[in-house]
């Protein structure tokens, strides 16, 4: 029997075994995880940081089996495990003809958000989707697309999103797209640095530019995991007038809200990502920003 076909109870047994292997034997990215956690929380003792670290690996293995289960779980069973809050605010935006955008970080299980469209009842025609970066392997790329679209959402490659959104607007199609916006940009894509988890952090600003261009109502998606296999996704309105906000204000507000989410329960953040590998000192040494573009000095 494949992993995806096993009941959740059996999946979490597999997850526990994988956690032991990943943490104690393979030691997957242990150095990066430890460094990220201790530098993000200098006020915490080493024992507290190790507790977060162990919790992270346990959640990370759960995330994997929960995501694989998306390929076989029924919509009814999935909805029994997740709760959406703030959907009424999204439907109010759709009622007045305004499209929406959700912005979130790599926290909790972001893959389960593909089920959002199942709870938007007043506008069943609305397009609910996520933006993704295609994988190098066509096989795994197709596998992940099918998995993410199994709950009725659509996947749009990052490079094509603006074209899709313009097309939806020309057809008067209401839509809600999710942007995972806490990745580490390459040097040539750095236009803004922000304080985030005790680091001077380079951040992407492309999501905000698209939201302004499309006049989206922007929602921060707060994630909670009250118990194993249960998630609460709360859509919190950041603004329904993005064009009236100062430049980069949406991005700044997002990172403040994301840090609040992480500090509430740190173990569910993706600490294995080498988030702070690029520094402002290295950037300033080789690059500068001219007329909104990053160029070499």
Give the label of every model feature segment.
Residues 20-21, 77, 130-132, 193-196, ...:
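Short, contiguous strand/loop micro-motifs
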Residues 25, 81-82, 136, 157, ...:
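Residues that cap or flank secondary-structure elements
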Residues 93, 117-120, 168, 261:
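Hydrophobic helix-cap positions at the C-terminus of alpha-helices
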Residues 1-104, 109, 141-146, 152:
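Membrane-anchoring hydrophobic helices of lipid-metabolizing enzymes
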Residues 51-54, 146, 150, 159-297:
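Non-catalytic C-terminal accessory region of glycerolipid acyltransferases
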Residues 96-159, 186-195:
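Catalytic core of membrane glycerolipid acyltransferases/transacylases, capturing the structured
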Residues 91, 115, 208-209:
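Alpha-helical segments flanking ligand/cofactor-binding loops in enzyme cores
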């Amino acid at each position: 029997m494949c992993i995806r076909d096993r009941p959740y109870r059996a999946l979490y047994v597999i997850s526990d075994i994988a956690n032991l292997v990943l943490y104690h034997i393979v030691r997957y990215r242990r150095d990066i995880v430890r460094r990220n956690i201790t530098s993000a929380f200098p006020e915490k003792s080493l024992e507290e940081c190790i507790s977060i670290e162990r919790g992270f690996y346990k959640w990370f293995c759960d995330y994997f089996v929960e995501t694989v289960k998306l390929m076989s779980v029924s919509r009814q069973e999935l909805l029994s495990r997740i709760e959406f809050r703030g959907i009424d605010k999204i439907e109010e935006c759709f009622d007045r003809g305004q499209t929406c955008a959700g912005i979130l970080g790599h926290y909790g299980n972001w893959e389960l958000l593909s089920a959002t469209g199942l709870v938007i009842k007043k506008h069943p025609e609305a397009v609910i989707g996520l933006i993704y970066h295609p994988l190098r392997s066509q096989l795994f790329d197709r596998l992940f697309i099918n998995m993410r679209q199994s709950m009725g959402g659509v996947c749009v490659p990052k490079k094509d999103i603006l074209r899709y959104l313009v097309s939806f607007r020309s057809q008067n199609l209401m839509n809600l797209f999710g942007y995972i916006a806490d990745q580490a940009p390459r040097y040539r894509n750095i236009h803004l640095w922000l304080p985030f988890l005790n680091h001077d952090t380079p951040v992407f600003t492309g999501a905000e530019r698209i939201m302004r261009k499309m006049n989206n109502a922007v929602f921060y998606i707060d994630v909670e995991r009250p118990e194993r296999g249960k998630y609460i996704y709360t859509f919190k309105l950041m603004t329904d007038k993005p064009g009236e906000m100062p430049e980069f204000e949406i991005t700044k507000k997002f990172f403040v809200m994301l840090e609040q989410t992480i500090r509430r329960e740190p173990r569910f953040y993706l600490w294995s990502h080498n988030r702070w590998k690029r520094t402002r000192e290295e950037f300033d040494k080789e690059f500068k920003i001219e007329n909104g573009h990053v160029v070499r000095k």
